[in-house]
Amino acid sequence: MDTGIWKVYGPVPEDAFGFIYEIVNITNGKKYIGKKQMKRKIRRLPLKGKKRKRVDYKESDWKTYTGSSDALNIDIATQGLDKFVFKILKFCNSKFELSYFEAKEQFERDVLLSEDYYNGIINCRIGKPPKQLLEQYYNQ
């Protein structure tokens, strides 16, 4: 599978919804931790005679995505893509997993307290996990 600018260590799961990533500036060592959805929801008109809208998924721009940090994107524009390493740390199967593991990774690395990171905010809104995920977690 073509992964664009991203380095992947291991196979890309077919059912992956998104991933947690790290971008490293080779010149100064600064890093950025974030998440990206690989699929996006498309709402379509209902079929003739039906009332409910249809939901489809389409591949997002993840292969060329460079993060949402303004400071990071300015550095990428001025220094060039070749001065950065784009690594996928973990694949996730749901929005909940994506938000949870991004926040977990950011808190474990103290991204807001360190000058070594581009991250300026940990923006996360997480509810109760799906029962299926809890069962997986407790059965490991």
Predicted regions and their residues:
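Structure-specific nucleic-acid interaction/processing domains
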Residues: M1-Q140
